[in-house]
Structure formats: structure tokens, C-alpha cells
Amino acid sequence: LYKVPHMEKNKIEILCTLGPSSFDGQVIKRLDGLGVGLFRINLSHTKAHDLASIIETIQSNTDVPICLDTEGAQVRTGDFVQTQIELKENSIVCGHRRKVSGDAENFNFYPKNIVDEFQIGDLISIDFNSVLVQVTGIKEEGVILRVINGGLVGRNKAVTVDRDIALSPLTENDQACLAIGLERKLNHYALSFASCRDDVDKIRQLTRDDAFIISKIESLTGLANLVDIATASDALLIDRGDLSRQVPLERIPEVQKAIIKNAKDMNRKVYVATNLLESMITHPTPTRAEVNDIYNTLLDGADGLVLAAETAIGAHPIACASMVVKMVRNFEKPKLADPLEYPFDPISLLVEPHGGRLVQRLASVKECEQVTDLIQLSVSSTTLLDCEQIAYGTYSPLTGFMNHQTCESVLETNRLPDGTIWTMPILLAAPEIAANSFGVGDRVALAGANGKVYATLDVSEIFTMDLELVAQKWFNTISRDHPGVARLFKGGDRFVAGDVCLVERLPSTHRHYELTPAQSRYIFAHKGWSKVIGFYTHNPIHRGHEHMQLKALEDTGADGLYINPVIRPKECGDFMPGPIMLSYQTMLDLGLFPKGKVILGSVAAYSRYAGPREIVFTALCRKNMGCSHYIICNDHTGVEYFHALESNQEFIESLGDFGIQLVFFDTVGYDTSTACYGPASDSVNMHAIDDTQIRAYLRDGKSIPEWMMREVVQESLRSEIAKNKTLFVE
């Protein structure tokens, strides 16, 4: 329903090459969402007969423009059967005119007639100088070569001859692909190995009048004619990889700076490609040298960065693009007065905390030592849970318990007084006799029933409210049968407002699973996630919830799923926290979730049974944890109390965008005729998967159908019973 807006386009453009690793609808959409400005198709690895379907697939998933990058005037190894061959040093091999399968003694070059241009004595370096051969003879079938420096040679890899060879600026494949691009109304084209102005004019003749031509500078000839090429082009692209075949590596930084300066002087855009994040082809994070190189490239004045192999064949295309986006954002953000000052909020691609800042309110050592001198107010366990979540930022932007004006604003407008969307009153009820012992301006110690202090409150207001009016606006009823209303009236009509500081967390038997918002954000960032689905639950996993989780992952193309069970106060008959966590840990241990896609972390919270208000509230809590999406079940947060799914959606739609996308699911059922899961209302053959029924099966010691709950999960729960551990709150 509520789409997280695309990340703002950066002034510095990001170009991504699509290939086997990224030619997938969901990956394309993710790259689009990250702010990629141009998708590159490398025609050196694309045949004309495949191009139309490739363009169609890309355009069906994004509106981002496509750039056809030509093969150009270059020599490459042939398309071997194997991915690579090995040429042994001092061996004699044949470079064929015709296509051959490729082995240690026979291979071919591309284009096929290039061998006619070779001369005896030519030195030929292959695959970025890893192999060096020399032409020693010419025969009808091809050229005879002696291997001076042996090694592995990949198929379709770059070849350099030690003298200039005149080649057509466009191959036959290029010309066929340009015709398809023209037919498909593509507007961006890159000319590889541009050597002179005539080359640029040639590609303009074969494309649209208003085509955006990017000329690639990757040879000494191109460098010599840089001004003429730039004059005829819309932009330049420095391909540092191919350029380094003719320019010594130690001179590449100097040459890069000179090209960028010339382009700027001529008012031409200039992009930089090759080896930006080479290590991330296999590793999830870059090297420090790569990060430093990118920053210096931006300092040089580059208008854009091009990801090539990193996103085309690398193992982490989204992580690569995310890293570049973070670096660009860091470069473009306002500079600190002191560059050595570390910013409070590092660059993150995760959804921004609600209100723009993750609240952190932990008492200092000195403040903790002073709590014994404070007036003590004994409060409920749920109030202490609120203190903990306020302090760790789960309720950001709240810094404490609401005053009268803020509560009224939330109940009347679903917004805080500053206009920020917020739907849940967060109140601290205090008996009149207790409230009379302190006043506005005092600092009060908030203690549990055991007398232990867990938080402090800086009192800003003490006020009363009409509980029936509050209940009607909050829960849409004043019935004491509603558990939320009952809790409200039990606390009384006197409330205390003020900022909170956490002194100590409540004891927990599941602390090892609990993650604060800062911790969950750290984990997501460490995994390279920026699009995360949150799932909040009070129950062990069953097939219905599993279907929702996997379907949401598939439909949204999210990087990962954050399963966030609640582990604190429950109603009689609810599942205990232990069995819930055990069921999910069993799924993870047995590899039943997609590998690397799921994080399990619990939250100390409680239900308020506030229907659509609570849906939005729990969504905002997940947003603060770093989730961009949030799954809503039809029985979410106790909506069986006085609320219907339709009214929930109407309420949520009335709020507008609040920065997290909700993914709604109706009750999931299993179709016995097709063995498929889907909405329970879809077919008469659908059998609804119901939490209440699962509880009944477990209480009665009956086996649950496999289609309702996995057998391994059932076994884990039955093992708890066998250990005399209770599954339910009694």
C-alpha cells in the first residue's frame, strides 16, 4: 500500500552493467530503487539475436534508461567451450581464423578476420597481460604463436597487439544491435575504443538525432584525439582497465585526472569505470584501497561511476550498488567543519528512523549512582517495558511519556503536535496519592514491584483525562470487555509526562535474542541489506506465516526478512516466549529459510489491542528497527477486538505515507486439490490455517497436519512438553 519512495537521485550518476548476476526482475527493481541512473548492456557479451528480449525484460521492470555499449574496435579471444584454457610457457599454439572449441594448443580470436592483420614478430598480450605470445608464422588456418609468458586465458577476453591495427569502429554485431536499439527507441549509446571524431560521427549516423553518445577513452589513439572526440560526444567514459593495457598502471591516476579536467573544460560529462569495487565480485565488502580510489575519483570531478563486472557477474550486485550509493551520499553531504569529527549518524541506506533520528536515552554512570536519592514511583511491568523501548529508540521520535496536548493530538489527528504521524498514546498512569509526592521539574525513579529502579523520569506535566472519552477515541469502544480498555481504566485517570532515561534493562530469559533498533540496523547494514521486511508475531511458526514471509520476500524483492517475535507479557492461553523462539530457531538450524535471508530477533513488548492504531504503531517500531516493509496479518495485534480488516485499511489509507510499506495478507489456507497455499477465501477447497486450532491440537496432544505446521517444528514443541516445560501462559 505505502511504497517507500525511491532514494533521491544523486548529483553524481551511477551506471550499472546488467549481466548473469543481475539480469533478474527483482534485482533490476532493487538497483532502480537504489538510484541507479543508467543500465548498461555490454554488447561484447550480448548477441544481436538476444538483445530484443533483454531490452524487453529490463523495460518491464524499470523506467531507468538503457545504454548499449558497443564492442567497438577491439580484439578479443574467441568464445571457447570452456570458460578458460591454459597456455603453457614456451609452447607453440595456433590462433585460428575459424571458431574452434579452444584448448592448450588451439584457439581463435574475434573478430574472425583479425588474424589477417597480424604480422610475424607481433607481440600479443591476452587477458590483461596475464599471457604474452608472439607471432612466429602465418598459415592458411591461422597464425602460429609461441607462448612467451604462460597462464590462463579466459573466453571473450581482451587482446592487445603491440602496434596499432586499423579496425572498424563498429562490429557487425554492433550495427545489428544499434538497429534494434533504434527500433526500441533507446537514447543512450556508448562507443568503445573511440579513436577519432569520425568514429563518433559513425555511431551518430546509426542512432537517433538526439541520441546521448558516450565515447569511451581506452586507448592511446583515443587519448591523442581526446579534444576532437569530446567535441563530437555528449560524455566521455574512462575505461581504466582497457586503458591500462597501453598506459602504464602507475600513470593511470594522472591520466584520469587529465581526462576529467579536459572534459570539464569542454562542459562534457565524464564517467569512470573498471576496478571500482573489484573485490566485491567475490567478497561482500570492498577493500579500503577501493573506497579511497572511489573517493579520489569523485574529488577529481567525475560525474558518474560505472559498475561493470561487479554487477554483471559478481556475487553481490546489490551490495556493490549500495556501497557506491553510500560513498556518493557521503561525498555529497555537507562537509563537517572538522573533517576529523565522526558524524553521529553514519551514511545508511536503511529506511530513516521515524522523525529522522534514532532516540537513545540511557542514563549515565553518574545518573545511575544518584537514583537512590530520588523519589520512587512504583509502576507496572508494561510501563517499564515502555521505558526500555523509549530509551532504545523503538518509539522514536518519542523521548518519554506523553503530555496532555500530545495525547490529545494523537487521539484526534493521529499525529504528534509537530505533524509527525503517530497513532498510539504512550502514557504513564500514576495513582493520585503517588503523584502528590512530586511535582513538575522533579526527577523521579521508576521502580518495579520488587522496588528495583529501572528508569528515571523528568516530570514535565501531571494531568487528568476523561477515560471514557480516551477509550472511545483510542479503542473505538468503552467496553470493559476490551482488554485495552480494561488496562486503561485499571491505571486510573491521572497521568505523568516527561522524558525517560533507562537505568537498567528488565531481566530476561531471552536476552540473547533481543535486539535494540541500533543493533538490528547494524546487522542489516553489515549484511548489506537496505530493503528489509519485518514480521511481528506472538506464535510459533506455522505454514500460513511461512507462506506470508516467503511470498513477501518474493513479491517485494527485499534483501532480507526480520522475524521479530514478542517475548514479554501475554494473556492467558498465549504461547510462552520459549516455544516461539524455538520454532523459528529450528527452521533456521535446518536451513528451511532461504540462505542468508532471515534474521531472528525478539522484542520486549506487549499488545494494546488497538486495531488499526496498533498496526501503524508496530509498523513504525519496525521502521525504527530498520525495516522498509512490514507484514500485516488479518488478526494482527488482536484486531479480532472490535475491528475488521477493511476498517484497518481505511484508517491506514487516511494517514498517507509514513515511510514504511505495509504488506497485507488475509488468512492463509491450503488447497488440498492443488497442494498450494493462498488466501483462504480463494477456493472451496481451501482449509484455513488457524492459530487457535493449532493451540488446540497441541493442548490435546494431537498431531498437526504437515500442511498446517512442519513436522520438525511440531517435534521441537513436543520435546518441550516432554521436558515438562509449558507451552502456554496459564
Q: Where are the model-predicted features located?
A:
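Non-catalytic helical/linker scaffolds that mediate oligomerization, partner binding
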Residues: 2-344
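Active-site cores that bind ATP or allylic diphosphates and position pyrophosphate for catalysis
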Residues: 345-730
